[in-house]
Swiss-Prot record:
Coenzyme F420-(gamma-Glu)n binds at Q32, Q37, S50, A56, K57, T58, R59, N60, W77, S78, Y79, H138. Homodimer. This is F420H(2)-dependent reductase Rv1155. GO terms for molecular function: coenzyme F420 binding; FMN binding; oxidoreductase activity, acting on the CH-CH group of donors; protein homodimerization activity; pyridoxal phosphate binding. InterPro entries: F420-binding_dom_put, F420H2_bilvrd_red/Heme_oxyg, Pyridox_Oxase_N, Split_barrel_FMN-bd. The keyword Endoplasmic reticulum does not apply. Belongs to the F420H(2)-dependent biliverdin reductase family. F420H(2)-dependent reductase able to catalyze the reduction of biliverdin-IXalpha to bilirubin-IXalpha in vitro. However, kinetic parameters show that it is less efficient than the biliverdin reductase Rv2074 and suggest biliverdin-IXalpha is unlikely to be the native substrate of Rv1155, which probably catalyzes the reduction of an alternative molecule in vivo. Binds coenzyme F420, but does not bind FMN or other flavins. Cannot use pyridoxine 5'-phosphate, pyridoxamine 5'-phosphate, pyridoxal 5'-phosphate (PLP), the anti-tuberculosis drug PA-824 or aflatoxin analogs as substrates.
Length: 147
């Protein structure tokens, strides 16, 4: 598959932050918006987010995997939106399963090392955490300096 070419200024907005607004599609077609913390991998052009199985955004994505993430720049006016088709892991079911391992990698990418990985692993299972991976298929927005 050929690598997509996106505006570097818009990718810089996504890369320069770790908090955005995830938009999913409700059963009636209206958007459902959630503030999320994310990790952007610029080499693979994908965004990853930890979400929980019983939540609306997860149900929405299992029904319709189309999603967008809005990221604001520091100036308050500039922004980038990344769109794609979400891929979801199964919910974490055991402290040593593949989903928990993927969530640990995400945590490390966002925050570094955790003070108690055993506690973290159990929390991922208790919360029924899921890894959302959003390969970016389209980016649009208003880069800094364009207003």
């Amino acid at each position: 598959m050929a690598r997509q070419v996106f505006d570097d200024k818009l990718l810089a907005v996504i890369s320069g932050n770790s908090i955005g607004v995830l938009a999913t599609i409700k059963h009636d077609g209206r958007p459902q918006l959630s503030n999320v913390q994310y990790h952007f991998d610029p080499r693979k052009l994908l965004i990853q987010v930890s979400i929980a199985e019983p939540r609306a955004k997860t149900r929405n994505l299992r029904r319709d995997p189309r999603a967008s993430i809005l990221v604001d720049a520091d100036d308050g006016w500039s922004y980038a939106v990344a769109e794609g088709t979400a891929q979801l892991t199964p919910p974490a079911a055991a402290p040593d399963d593949d989903t928990v391992e993927a969530l640990i990698a995400l945590y490390r990418n966002i925050a570094g090392e955790h003070s108690d990985w055993d506690d973290y692993r159990q929390a991922m299972v208790t919360d029924r955490r899921v890894l959302l991976t959003l390969p970016i298929s389209h980016v649009y927005g208003l880069p800094p300096g364009m207003r």
